[in-house]
Amino acid sequence: MPEGKIVKALSGFYYVQHEEGITQCRGRGVFRKNKITPLVGDQVVFQADNPSEGYVLEVFDRKNELVRPPIANVDQAILVFSAVEPDFNPGLLDRFLVLIEYHNIKPIICISKMDLVDEKMRETVEAYANDYREMGYDVLFTSINTSESIDILKPFLEGCVSVVAGQSGVGKSSMLNVLRPELELKTNDISSHLGRGKHTTRHVELIAIGSGLVADTPGFSSLDFIDIEVEDLTYCFPELKEASQYCKFRGCTHLSEPKCAVKAAVEEGKITEYRYKNYKQFVEEIRERKPRY
C-alpha cells in the first residue's frame, strides 16, 4: 500500500501528498470507532483508485501533536512577533515558548516589521533579541516589505515541517505570501480599536516552500496551560532548567524555597527579571487552574 503525508484537512477530507502527487481521501470508519482523528502532518498508509477518491487506512505513530492548531509531527515553530503594530510583547512570546518547549518542538523567534521601528524601539527590540539568543534561541529580524530579509528565514525551513504561529496581526500571512507569492493568503490590517489583527487563516495546511513544509496555523486560542503542571514549567525555560540543577531541594519551584539556585541567578543578573516574573505568573495560573474531570 502507498504511504504519504496529510498536507491538508478540510470538511472531512484528507489531502495526502505522496510520490505521484496529492490524493483526496476520507478516513476509514475504524478511526471513529477507535477515537483516532487523522491530523495534518500525519504519515499515513492510504488506498486510492483515482486522485479524488481514496481512503486513509493507517496512521503511523506521532513524535508530537498539537491540539490547537491540530497538527502532528512538527519539527520546529516559527514564532512571529512584530517589533511594532502591535508592539513587541515578551510576555506573550514566553507563553508561546513554554507551549512549544513542552511539546519538544524547536522554536525560532522571528521579529517582523523591523522596517517600521524608530531608533529607540530598535534598541529595545535588539536588547530583547540578545537576551533570547543568550538563552539559546535563534532570533531573526524580518521586514515584510523587503523580500531580501524574508530570505533570511528560508534556510531554516529546508527539510523541516514548520509551524508558523504568533500574535495576531504580526504579518504571518504576509510573510508566507513573500515566500510563496502564488499563495495569495488573505491578510487584514490591524484594528485601531483593539490594536490587534483579525485572524485571516481558516484551516491548517502544509505548504511546500523549498524542500520544507510550512503550516500557517490559525488562532492563538490554545495559550492556556491545560496539560502543563508546575513541575513541568522549569523545563520549558532553558535558563531556569540549567540553573535548577544546583538548587538544594529536588522539586524546587523557585518561589520560596531556601538555597534556590534559580533565585540566586536572578539576583546575579544571569536570568532576566522579566523571564522570572513570567515564570512566576505562569506558576500562579497553573495553580489556579480548575481541575478537569
Curated annotation (Swiss-Prot):
Q: How is the cofactor bound?
A: Binds 1 zinc ion per subunit.
SUPFAM superfamilies per the record?
A: Nucleic acid-binding proteins, P-loop containing nucleoside triphosphate hydrolases
Per its UniProt entry, which superkingdom is the organism in? Bacteria
Pfam families per the UniProt record, alphabetical:
RsgA_GTPase, RsgA_N
List the cofactors. Zn(2+)
Q: Which residues are GTP-binding? A: S112, K113, M114, D115, G166, Q167, S168, G169, V170, G171, K172, S173, S174
Enzyme Commission no? 3.6.1.-
Per the database record, which ranges form the CP-type G domain?
63-223
Subcellular localization(s) per the UniProt record: Cytoplasm
Give GO cellular component annotations, separated by semicolons: cytoplasm
The UniProt keyword set, sorted, is: Cytoplasm, GTP-binding, Hydrolase, Metal-binding, Nucleotide-binding, Ribosome biogenesis, RNA-binding, rRNA-binding, Zinc
Q: Which annotated residues bind Zn(2+)?
A: C247, C252, H254, C260
Assembly and partners? Answer: Monomer. Associates with 30S ribosomal subunit, binds 16S rRNA.
Protein name listed in UniProt: Small ribosomal subunit biogenesis GTPase RsgA
Q: What is its main location?
A: cytoplasm
Q: Which family does it belong to?
A: Belongs to the TRAFAC class YlqF/YawG GTPase family. RsgA subfamily.
Q: What is the scientific name of the source organism? A: Bacillus anthracis
An example molecular function term from Gene Ontology annotations: rRNA binding
Q: What does this protein do?
A: One of several proteins that assist in the late maturation steps of the functional core of the 30S ribosomal subunit. Helps release RbfA from mature subunits. May play a role in the assembly of ribosomal proteins into the subunit. Circularly permuted GTPase that catalyzes slow GTP hydrolysis, GTPase activity is stimulated by the 30S ribosomal subunit.
Q: Which biological processes are named by the entry's GO terms?
A: ribosomal small subunit biogenesis
